[in-house]
Amino acid sequence: MIFPSPLTEARLIRRYKRFLADVVLADGTELTVSVPNTGSMLGLTAPGSRVLLSKWDDPKRKYPYRLEIVEADGTLVGINTGLPNRLAAEAIRARLVGDLGTYPVIRPEQRYGERSRIDFLLEHPERPPAYVEVKNVHFMREAGLAEFPDTRTDRGARHLDELAAMRRAGNRAVMIYVVQRADCSRFRLCADLDASYAAAFGRARDAGVEAFVIGCQISADAIAPDRLIDLDF
């Protein structure tokens, strides 16, 4: 995924109200920018952190700048939770994710389960449909180890239970985690931060739900899925 225009460098002053952050540009201008991430962004909100912003050329937008990338410990980390679906689709089409790239039809945002939408429904004329859920990952406490979630997510646990139900019904069900940082080679669940999610993942795996973790290269120009990361359980 290539950013449509060059990103603007700034320094983080603070993040607040989940969706907002104050930053200062290189020329000293202070701005309030939107934050496309409802999670805690644990470890990524230190004042003074280098950040990269995209800009919308829309005079109707209250906040024309949007936070896209935070630098943490010398590594660029993508925080936009609207991008993982796009990155997962790129990885699937590039045949990085098992045999999912052999499904000729990829339908985004399809209704299923109880009041939910699946991120992708993959269809093949000779195979059961594949229900694919995608989650964003940017949390790292131990060098090289990506973790999810960084806060409690009851919605995420429900999605795993619904994937398990789809698998028991004879469909294929797949959980994809997209790690928006290049310094991780392993992945595990944060059972200490959300035991319920870890338990739901165990139930899903027992039901036959597949799991893949996609790693990405991050730069000021693009975010590119380029490899699978090992699950460390």
Curated annotation (Swiss-Prot):
Q: Which family does it belong to?
A: Belongs to the SfsA family.
InterPro entries the UniProt entry points to: SfsA (IPR005224), SfsA_C (IPR040452), SfsA_N (IPR041465)
- How is this protein named in the record? Sugar fermentation stimulation protein homolog
Q: Which residues form a coiled coil?
A: none
Name one matching Pfam family.
SfsA
Cross-referenced Gene3D superfamilies: 2.40.50.580, 3.40.1350.60
Q: Name one GO molecular function term.
A: DNA binding
Which HAMAP family does its entry note?
Answer: SfsA
Q: According to the lineage, what is the superkingdom? A: Bacteria
